[in-house]
C-alpha cells in the first residue's frame, strides 16, 4: 500500500500542471538553448512566457495559443516575440528577441511571468 501511495505521488509530481513549477524530474536535467521546448514542458514554458512564438499557432495572420485554451485568438503582431529557452539545474531562462533583446531569469521551481512592458 505504501508503495502505491509513493508511486501515485511521484506520478502526480511528474505531471506538468498550469501554474505549478516544472516537475522536479525535469529541473535536474540540463536543457540546451532551444527555440522549441520539449512537448512535455510546453505548458510550463508557455504559462510564464505567454509572448513566446513557440506558444502560438498562426495561420493566415490569426494566432491561437497552443496551451492556454482561455487565451483569445489574436491577430499576428508584435505581441508575439521570438523566444528561445534554456535550463541549467534549477535556473530557467527565456531569451526574448523583440526589437530590444531581453533575458528573463527565474528559479525553475519558483517561476514568475515576464512582461515586455
Swiss-Prot record:
Signal peptide positions (record): 1-16
InterPro entries for the chain: ASFV_fam_110
Pfam families xrefs: v110
Organism domain of life: Viruses
Keyword annotations from UniProtKB, A to Z: Early protein, Signal
Family classification: Belongs to the asfivirus MGF 110 family.
Protein name: Protein MGF 110-13L
Species this chain originates from: African swine fever virus (isolate Portugal/Lis 57/1957)
Amino acid at each position: 500500500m505504501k508503495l502505491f501511495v509513493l508511486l501515485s505521488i511521484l506520478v502526480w509530481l511528474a505531471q506538468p500542471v498550469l501554474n505549478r513549477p516544472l516537475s522536479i524530474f525535469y529541473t535536474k536535467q540540463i536543457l540546451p538553448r532551444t527555440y522549441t521546448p520539449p512537448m512535455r514542458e510546453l505548458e510550463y514554458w508557455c504559462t510564464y512566457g505567454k509572448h513566446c512564438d513557440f506558444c502560438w499557432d498562426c495561420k493566415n495572420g490569426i494566432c491561437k495559443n497552443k496551451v492556454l485554451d482561455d487565451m483569445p485568438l489574436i491577430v499576428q503582431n508584435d505581441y508575439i516575440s521570438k523566444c528561445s529557452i534554456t535550463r541549467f539545474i534549477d535556473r530557467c531562462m527565456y531569451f526574448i528577441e523583440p526589437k530590444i533583446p531581453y533575458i528573463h531569469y527565474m528559479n525553475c521551481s519558483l517561476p514568475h511571468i515576464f512582461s515586455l512592458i
